[in-house]
Amino acid sequence: MNDGYQMLAEFYRLKQGGLGPLRSWLDRNWKVAADRVAESQLHKLIVDLNFPALYTTNYDRNLEAAFEVHGKAYAKIANAKQMADAADGVTHIVRYHGDFDDDASLVLTETDFLDRLSFDSPLDIKFRADALARTILFIGYSMSDPNIRLLLHGIWQTWERSGYRDHRPRSFVFMASSNPVQEAMLARWGITLLTPESEACADDALTAFLADIRARIRRP
């Protein structure tokens, strides 16, 4: 959601006293039929790649639906309790901006996003721990999002202050087209920009990229 939608959500909460009806409407209208998810090559690739953790800022349930239709176990994490209860050995789907099943977890309004800038919520702590110990691949994030830029800067700053920056696991951002400004920003934070060799729409480029990763992993 962009800044305009965040302000609209804030206005709605101020006028209505809560987000319940809006949340229910969004949940209904963003729901994608299971058969459509099952037909999605992109979602099949995400399941096949067996990532230890998937962080999403989306509010839809497409990732969970993909794991269910392909018979793969997962653990959804949107709050501290779910984090503690999450099983080992399965993909953790971390709903970074909350889940419609838990209104208190939602990061939807202007105030929610401003409050989140402190980056001290349980999900922020989990992400920082994962980012310190693992290779991170960012897909579909906009560098125009100040929350994302602050988060990336914070990870870089942590490594710079640690005295062990040369031991930092590599991190990557995949984008469908190159942008020299964003590439320079990302390089400053120690993140490599990946782009397709040929022009394609964003979904096709991402599907081809993930298919290539899967092929390389399966290669004897």
Where in the sequence are the language-model features?
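Structural motif
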Residues: 55, 93-95, 137-138
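Conserved subregion of the PPM/PP2C metallophosphatase catalytic domain
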Residues: 64-68
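Gly/serine-rich nucleotide phosphate-binding loop at the start of the catalytic core
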Residues: 1-47, 52-55, 63, 199
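SIR2/sirtuin-family catalytic core signature
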Residues: 18, 37, 41-51, 70-73, ...
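Active-site glycine-rich loop that binds ribose-phosphate moieties when present
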Residues: 108-125
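A charged nuclease-like catalytic/ligand-binding cleft shared by nucleic-acid processing domains
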Residues: 13-26, 32, 91-110
